[in-house]
């Protein structure tokens, strides 16, 4: 069975040596306390999650696929996908770069991009589920009315809605 090995050193090279991310983040008031150790710790945990949770579901998920129950109009996802999403939510990953005003962690978006790079590499089919939700979050956060933000963003941030 193929194994996913997250490219942590490559990501650390880009973040630290190429972009100087920790120094750049210090110039941004909301991220001034984020240092290289914090960036590395989040990358390591994201890599561990990607390798241990969605990656093992990649081949079995492709083989099984989704199925529509025509009687109930419900879609059944491959075995393990629902549990993997529950672990994603439990780990706080939906909230990683989301606004703390809506329950997010407020970490830099660059970390969210690294997370999604690893998730897509580990299991692109599974990653569509949280990825679409994060896109909806970003759209509403940028363009939603105050009422839409109040209604939708906390549920998307927590992972309750996907």
What are these regions (language model features)?
Residues 1-127, 147, 151, 155:
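Amphipathic, small/basic residue-rich leader segments at the start of a protein or domain
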Residues 137-162:
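Phosphate/diphosphate-binding loops
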Residues 134:
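His/Asp/Glu-enriched, well-ordered alpha-helical/loop segment
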């Amino acid at each position: 069975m193929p194994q996913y090995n997250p490219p942590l050193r490559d990501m650390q090279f880009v973040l630290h040596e190429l972009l100087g991310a920790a120094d750049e983040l210090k110039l941004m008031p909301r991220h001034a306390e984020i240092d290289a150790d914090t960036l590395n710790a989040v990358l390591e945990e994201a890599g561990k999650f990607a390798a241990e949770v969605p990656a093992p579901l990649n081949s079995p998920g492709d083989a099984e696929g989704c199925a529509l129950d025509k009687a109930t109009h419900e879609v059944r996802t491959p075995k393990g996908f629902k549990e993997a999403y529950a672990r994603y939510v439990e780990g706080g990953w939906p909230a990683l770069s989301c606004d703390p005003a809506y329950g997010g962690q407020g970490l830099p978006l660059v970390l969210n991009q690294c997370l999604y790079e690893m998730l897509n590499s580990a299991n692109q089919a599974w990653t569509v589920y949280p990825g679409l939700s994060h896109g909806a979050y970003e759209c509403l956060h940028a363009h939603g009315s105050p009422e839409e933000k109040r209604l939708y963003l906390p549920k998307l941030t927590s992972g309750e809605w996907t």
